[in-house]
Regions:
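Acidic, glycine-rich loop-and-strand cores that form catalytic or ligand-binding grooves
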Residues: 43, 47
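Catalytic core of nucleotidyl cyclases, primarily class III adenylyl/guanylyl cyclases
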Residues: 1-39, 49-103, 127-138, 151-158
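Intrinsically disordered, glycine/charged-rich C-terminal tails and inter-domain linkers
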Residues: 49, 71, 76-77, 85-88, ...
Length: 266
């Protein structure tokens, strides 16, 4: 994994009498990687918005054949974001396999799978989170500190809250331009600034339930949980769950997951 202290270093350890070298790369030294990381998260969030705005998708979801007990079918997607090194195009001059070899590819897949467990649309590792701009980090939420299969290193995980049980306004091109809507959206992406996190209507509407009061209470609850003060953590996380009753899950997925973990180990 990426060094948490953001330094390039070589560690040596003795294994069966041999010296094994482990290298970590400081990705923060790559220019423009903060914007690239911001755009990666922003792109996935826009996908979440569009599956709740597109007329064809909405019509498909409301079809009677897919209804269950009178409720419309829900379409949900999960995304995992991680950053690290990888080897591309493995092979020889005669044949190249267009694939990637890296443990970091597997880490992204595990984050995507864990997004369902935590009931969130996006799950990020600390390695990815630390590459983003301060503005993007400020609107994300730390959920837990976990270890994943294949790694013994505990790491924080983060999400951007998405309230999907709502209608998003239709996108229309301004009347005073000859550009198509697709061209305008591409231009907007090319001209990205960190102001998007506090001005973009879709993003603000998407995280509408994650109020400052909710974020502060969840932060206090997760800190109590990590400090093994589970009685206090239960009280705070139960309150957080109630504050998210209007969400498509009928509560807060991360709070429910952690409450379930504590309940099974009480």
């Amino acid at each position: 994994l990426i060094d948490n202290n953001a330094r390039k270093r070589i560690q040596s350890q003795q294994s069966d009498g041999e010296t094994v070298h482990h290298a970590s790369v400081n990705l923060k030294r790559i220019p423009g990687l903060d914007d690239l990381s911001d755009k990666a998260l922003l792109g996935f969030l826009k996908v979440v918005v569009e599956i709740n705005r597109d007329k064809q998708v909405l019509a498909y979801r409301s079809g009677k054949r897919l209804q269950h007990e009178g409720h419309d079918f829900q379409l949900r997607m999960g995304f995992g974001l991680h950053a690290g090194w990888g080897m591309e195009a493995v092979g020889s001059l005669q044949k190249v396999d267009a694939t990637y070899l890296s443990p970091h590819v597997n880490m992204s897949a595990r984050m995507e799978a864990a997004s369902r467990q935590f009931g969130v649309a996006v799950l990020m590792t600390e390695s990815f989170f630390e590459l983003m701009s301060n503005e993007a980090q400020s609107v994300c939420r730390r959920l837990d500190i976990v270890t994943v299969k294949g790694s013994a290193q505990p790491m924080p995980i983060y999400t951007y809250d998405t309230f999907q049980n709502q209608e998003f306004p239709e996108l229309l091109a301004p009347k005073n331009t000859d550009l198509s809507l697709a061209s305008l959206l591409k231009k907007q992406a090319d001209n990205y600034t960190t102001r998007e996190w506090t001005t973009d209507r879709d993003l603000l509407q998407l995280r509408g339930l994650a109020t400052p009061a909710f974020n502060e209470k969840f932060k206090e609850g997760i800190n109590a949980y990590l400090a093994a003060n589970w009685a206090k953590a239960r009280q705070l996380l139960e309150e957080c769950d109630k504050m998210m009753e209007k969400s498509d899950r009928g509560g807060d997925g991360p709070s429910q997951t952690i409450l379930g973990y504590m309940r099974n180990r009480a």
